[in-house]
Amino acid sequence: MLSLQNRELFPVVTIIIMEAFINKMRRLKGVRKQLIVEEAWKALSSANMAEYLRYMYKTVRKYYGEAIVVTQEVDDIISSPVVKESIINNSDCKILLDQRKYMNKFDQIQALLGLTEKEKGQILSINMANNPSRLYKEVWIGLGGTQSAVYATEVSAEEYLAYTTEETEKVEVYRLAEKLGGDIEAAIRQLAEKRRTKS
């Protein structure tokens, strides 16, 4: 995937992508549309992009679409006053992973997200009592303040190896793929089988 680190190119490409999405959003009637902003902190650090996201969150549902912001830090959203209110106020579904590192300042997050005491308890319980014999992580999903729960998410060894962000595991996959003539699928299958036989 293309990495946009160039300070001159990034705003130009961003404007092109924004215009393309807005045009499709308005033109395609009855077709579900999604704008997913991964690594949102980069976008939110730009005033123009923050304003664009604010516009999208307020507008996209009128066109049978949804905007999704993915970030590893709640502070990314909290620190952008333009986006904070529009993203949070227009997000019916909130998904949170382990928030233990924010335990000391979770009251601020609770107030910002409008969480009940029950929801706060659910979120702070994530991954606290996982079964050590199973490989899974927990996630909290809240739906519009009406329903919320903690769910275990468990993937196969193949899925785990395909999407891992752990550098050592990625290197292991790529090294084996290189030995197998560049076949990443075969490397993932072999490593997954190796992991299954170890356990």
Regions found by a protein language model. Give the residues of each.
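Conserved P-loop NTPase motor cores
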Residues: 2-121, 157
